[in-house]
Amino acid sequence: MIRDRIKTEEYFQEAFEWYSQCLQEDIEDYEKEKPKDLMSHFRFMVINYENLLKVGYSLGKGVQSLFPYYQGILSNLKEVASEGVPFYRAVDVFSLGVLYSERKEEFLDDLRAIYDQMDHTDGLIEYYMVYLFHDKIVPFHSILEYQNMIEDTYESVAKAQDFWYYSHSDAPWYNNHTKDTYKGYWSFDTAATCKIKGIYDERLKDLEYFPYDLLVQG
């Protein structure tokens, strides 16, 4: 069942098929003749895998069937992380790691390689990093103010979630639902923080942009 509340199932099915074709063509081109600009290839692969994960989740695909796309993001991002990792991408990458933490042995080396190359970070990313790498929960403060609002209750999450979309007005995907590049809006970071804090209230599934199925998987 489709999860997105803005576009149609047909829209996302067509988008998923398109991005799948783009990914396959990039893989085939790479296998035939390694491109001269390898860094550019890896950057495009990161985007391809990100697109498929987000569109696939919006479409309603199973969260475990999307896991290989997360692995694809990491395996390519680690090759270009030394150039810098955009902040919102870093937040998504680490929050998805928390949401898939039951399978972290399958991706932790790549995630660590990315983290080691990052020249700046944030309290939220450190929060996720410590949870994933050291199985510890530590206090944090983030430049994402809505994250600082989350306590140990559903009510605090609901209040924070009201600010999630508008807090990303400088993100490249902001307002994309008015274009044909829309892939869905999903607050992976809010769900990841809920997981660490142990907030699994069923009312979360009714919050706009909240990826509930990723939170309660398995």
Please place each PLM-identified region on the residue numbering.
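Alpha-helical oligomerization segments
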Residues: E155-G218
